[in-house]
Amino acid sequence: MSGGKKKSSFQITSVTTDYEGPGSPGASDSPVPPALAGPPPRLPNGDPNPDPGGRGTPRNGSPPPGAPASRFRVVKLPQGLGEPYRRGRWTCVDVYERDLEPPSFGRLLEGIRGASGGTGGRSLDSRLELASLGISTPIPQPGLSQGPTSWLRPPPTSPGPQARSFTGGLGQLAGPGKAKVETPPLSASPPQQRPPGPGTGDSAQTLPSLRVEVESGGSAAATPPLSRRRDGAVRLRMELVAPAETGKVPPTDSRPNSPALYFDASLVHKSPDPFGAAAAQSLSLARSMLAISGHLDSDDDSGSGSLVGIDNKIEQAMDLVKSHLMFAVREEVEVLKEQIRDLAERNAALEQENGLLRALASPEQLAQLPSSGLPRLGPSAPNGPSI
C-alpha cells in the first residue's frame, strides 16, 4: 500500500498438532486453545493474545519446510481487528502493520499538521491518539453511515487544569457491541489548549465532555486537544482524511495569514507640516523628510498604508519646492531692485552734468545741437561746418 493506507497482514497466535485443510468446515470460527502462560493482553473479541515469544512463525517469515505453500494467502481486511480463524493446524488473527520508522516519524508528523491545518487541531489530535491502537479515525460528519462500534474504557482522569492525560494509548478494548463511551464532564477550570497555528481556520473547541466513538467499519472519533503524555513504547500511525471521504470540504479562513496585509486607517500617523515662513526652517525640514521613511516603515501597515505614506511624502516635497522657489524669487527681486536703484542714481548724475554743460556752452554751440540730430543725453558730437 502507499500513502496513508495501512498494510494488511496476519499474525499466528497458536499452533496445533492436528492438520485440517484450508477448505474444511468450521475453519473460520474455531475457538482459540487456552493453553497460554501469564496474563496476556486482550483482543477485541475477548480471546487472549499470546506474548510475542510464543509465536510459532514470525510475521513475515516463511512457512515450515513440510507445509504446503497454498495454505497462506493475502487477504484484504476491513478496518478493525479480525476474528481468529484456522488455517490447517494454525490459528491466525488478522492484524494491521503499525511499524513506523523513527526517522520518518517527525517528517510525517509535520506534513500531517501542515496538511490538516484547515480542519483545526481537534481532529488531528484525535487521529493521533486513536492511531496508537491501529484504529482509523476519520472526522465525524452528520449523516455518515454508522457501523458496529466497540467499547472503550475511559482513560484515567487527574485533577487540575489538565483534566486527562493519555498514557500509552486510549484505553483497553473490551467485548464487541454497539455502544458509545462518554467520560465525566470536565472540572470547572478549563483545560489548557494548544494555540492554533497561523494557517488553521478553526480554533480548538472546548467540549463539556469527552465522547469517544470507535467503529470497526470506518466510523470516527473526536477528542478535544488536551495535553497528553504519550508512552515512548507506543508507536503512532497517522491517517489523513481526504475531504472527498468525509463528504465535507474543510473550512478555510478567508483572511490572509500575515498580519501585515491588514490596514487600519486610524493607525496612520500623519506628521504635522514642519514648514514655516522663515528660511531657517528649511534645513530642519530636509532632515525631517529623511526621517519620515523610517517613521512610516516602523508601522506594520502595508499596501494602502504605504500608499498613504507616499502621498504624504509627495505633499511635503511639493511644499518644500514651493518654499525654495519663493526664497529664490525674493532674492532675485532684491537684486533687481539694487540694479534699478543704481541706474536711477546714474541717470540723475548724467542729467545734472548735462545741465551744467548747457549752462557753460556758447550760443553758437547750442545752435548746432538741434541741427546735428543727436539726443540730448548722448555724447557730444564733433563740431560741424559753420553756416
Swiss-Prot record:
Residue list for modification Phosphoserine: S62, S165, S187, S189, S219, S254, S258, S271, S362
Which cysteines are cross-linked by disulfides?
none
Single biological process term from Gene Ontology: neuron cellular homeostasis
UniProt biased composition (Pro residues): 31-51
Name where it's found: Nucleus; Cytoplasm; Cell projection, Dendrite; Synapse
Where is it made, tissue-wise? Expressed in the liver (at protein level). Expressed in Purkinje cells and proliferating cerebellar granular neurons (at protein level). Expressed in the cortex, medulla and papilla of the kidney.
Q: Which InterPro entries match?
A: TSC22/Bun, TSC22/BUN_CS, TSC22D4
Write down which residues bear the modification named Phosphothreonine: T57, T183, T223
Where is the stretch described as Leucine-zipper?
Answer: 336-357
Q: Which GO terms describe its cellular component?
A: cytoplasm; dendrite; nucleus; synapse
The yes or no answer to whether the keyword Repressor is present is: yes
- Entry keyword annotation includes Flavoprotein: no
Q: What Gene3D superfamilies is this protein classified in?
A: Single helix bin
Q: What induces it?
A: Induced by TGF-beta treatment. Induced by a wasting-associated liver metabolism as a result of a methionine-choline deficient diet or cancer-induced cachectic phenotype. Induced by renal hyperosmotic stress.
Give me the ranges of the annotated region Disordered. 1-85, 135-232, 368-387
Its primary localisation, in coarse terms, equals nucleus
Q: Which UniProt keywords apply?
A: Cell projection, Cytoplasm, Nucleus, Phosphoprotein, Repressor, Synapse, Transcription, Transcription regulation
Query: What is noted besides the main data?
Result: Involved in the development of hyperglycaemia and insulin resistance in diabetic mouse models. May be involved in altered hepatic lipid handling as part of cancer-induced cachexia.
The text of the family note is:
Belongs to the TSC-22/Dip/Bun family.
Assembly: Forms a homodimer or heterodimer. Forms a heterodimer with TSC22D1 isoforms 1 and 2. Interacts with NRBP1.
- What function does this protein fulfil? Binds DNA and acts as a transcriptional repressor. Involved in the regulation of systematic glucose homeostasis and insulin sensitivity, via transcriptional repression of downstream insulin signaling targets such as OBP2A/LCN13. Acts as a negative regulator of lipogenic gene expression in hepatocytes and thereby mediates the control of very low-density lipoprotein release. May play a role in neurite elongation and survival.
Name the UniProt record assigns to this protein = TSC22 domain family protein 4
